[in-house]
Amino acid sequence: MNRRNLMSRGLLAALAFAAPITPVFAQQPDLSRKAVVDDPVAPKRAGKTYDVTVVEFFDYNCPYCRRMEPVLNALLRSDPRVRIVYRDWPIFGPASREASRAAVASQWQGRHAAFHGALLTSPARLDSAGIKAAAARAKIDWPRLERDLRTHGVEIDALLARTDGIARAIGFNGTPALIVGSQVVAGAVDLPTLRRLVAEARNKPAAR
């Protein structure tokens, strides 16, 4: 049974699990933790200081990614020492890729957080018109965004390719997926579970 069938049956939440990621890095010599958590082009949100990083692999047209967004926002509000790294993994088709490219480009005008939230709260499955409507809600300067897409397009496409390679190397088969410290989480989780994983990572400095 594939992931999309599970999603259609509403069973995905029951399949969320956590497993150590350390063996994955050991088995993939070309994959480093730094490459996953510190990509210079991947958008990030963090306070002035942080000691735990949560990496999210997501697709803007994934319904369970939309459910994860308020959970991650609540975590950031309640824990200023957490950093979120957003790894766009547009696996739901061309519109998802278009949304990801636009969202990543919006960071050059300092509007990624607003645009990211607007895309994930869009009332319908995203298409080109829906992406532009979300940009308007997020107060995106659209001509500037188009310029940034031209200027940084190669960087953005390279980021998406790196993220796809990392996700496949780890063994993810769908979105959302998280890395919290040294734990891989496949599927959506609730806030108490996410807080527990952050606390566990905080107690293991080498895995932050």
For each feature predicted by the language model, list its residue ranges.
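Extracytoplasmic thiol/disulfide redox context detector
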Residues: N2-G93, V154-A169, G174, N203-R208
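Short, flexible active-site loop motifs that bind/organize anionic cofactors or intermediates
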Residues: A16, V55, A102-A105, T121, ...
